[in-house]
């Protein structure tokens, strides 16, 4: 693979989506893999930009055809990552971000051993609950379920290569940028990227 595959995971409300958007805004060499989902769009979300929004029957059809690199059911909705999209982006030399949960991360790591996994933690459960309430998108019952799911998800933090705490947005963003830069500078990636230059020097 010419590009790097980054897995970014976080509990709902930890700020993952905002951090990923900020990463994309400042880096033309990195792309976000747009997942398929059966959940309804949130305010401001666009089909094909934030997610490919599909009916459950269509999702199951794609799943049965083996189109998904990984898939999972989260908060009652299905999510899946297109394998062909991932492979083509990496082959073209782009770094690719997968915004997926810990279950999807396990599936991807079993297929892409050199994928780089990052877990974003909230500074506290109280801060996480406040962020979920501030979004004003879910009922108290749904928020309670999300908090319970967050505790379960965070138990898998030890399975990831890198961890950052999103206490201050800019600090967490700089952590992510540092991780991406360090991976781009790894010997095996540099020798592929600058193959012509290296051959002339040796």
Swiss-Prot record:
InterPro entries associated with the record: GK/Ca_channel_bsu, Guanylate_kin-like_dom, Guanylate_kinase, Guanylate_kinase_CS, P-loop_NTPase
A Pfam family matched in the record: Guanylate_kin
Reactions the enzyme catalyzes: GMP + ATP = GDP + ADP
Cellular compartment(s): Cytoplasm
This protein's GO CC annotations: cytosol
Annotated ranges, domain Guanylate kinase-like: 3-181
Binding site residues for ATP: 10-17
GO MF entry, a single one: ATP binding
Keywords linked to the UniProt accession: ATP-binding, Cytoplasm, Kinase, Nucleotide-binding, Transferase
EC code(s) of this entry: 2.7.4.8
Disulfide-bond pairs as recorded: none
Presence of keyword Oxidoreductase: no
HAMAP family on file: Guanylate_kinase
PANTHER family xrefs: GUANYLATE KINASE, GUANYLATE KINASE-RELATED
The protein's role, per its UniProt record: Essential for recycling GMP and indirectly, cGMP.
Family listed: Belongs to the guanylate kinase family.
Name assigned to this protein: Guanylate kinase
Protein's organism: Methylobacillus flagellatus (strain ATCC 51484 / DSM 6875 / VKM B-1610 / KT)
């Amino acid at each position: 693979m010419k590009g790097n595959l980054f897995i970014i995971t976080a509990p709902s409300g930890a700020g993952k989506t905002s951090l990923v958007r900020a990463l994309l805004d400042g880096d033309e060499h990195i792309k976000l893999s747009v997942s398929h989902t059966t959940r309804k769009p949130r305010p401001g979300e666009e089909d094909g930009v934030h997610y490919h929004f599909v009916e459950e029957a269509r999702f199951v059809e794609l799943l049965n055809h083996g189109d998904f690199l990984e898939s999972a059911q989260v908060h009652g909705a299905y999510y899946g990552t297109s394998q062909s999209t991932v492979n083509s982006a990496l082959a073209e030399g782009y770094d690719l971000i997968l915004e997926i949960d810990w279950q999807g991360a396990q599936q991807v790591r079993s297929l892409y051993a050199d994928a780089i996994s990052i877990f974003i933690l909230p500074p506290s459960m109280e801060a996480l609950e406040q962020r979920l309430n501030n979004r004003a998108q879910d009922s108290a019952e749904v928020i309670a379920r999300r908090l319970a799911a967050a505790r379960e998800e965070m138990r898998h933090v030890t399975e990831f290569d890198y961890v950052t705490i999103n206490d201050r947005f800019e600090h967490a963003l700089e952590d992510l940028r540092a991780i991406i830069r360090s991976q781009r500078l790894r010997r095996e990636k540099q020798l592929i990227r600058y193959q012509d230059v290296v051959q002339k020097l040796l």
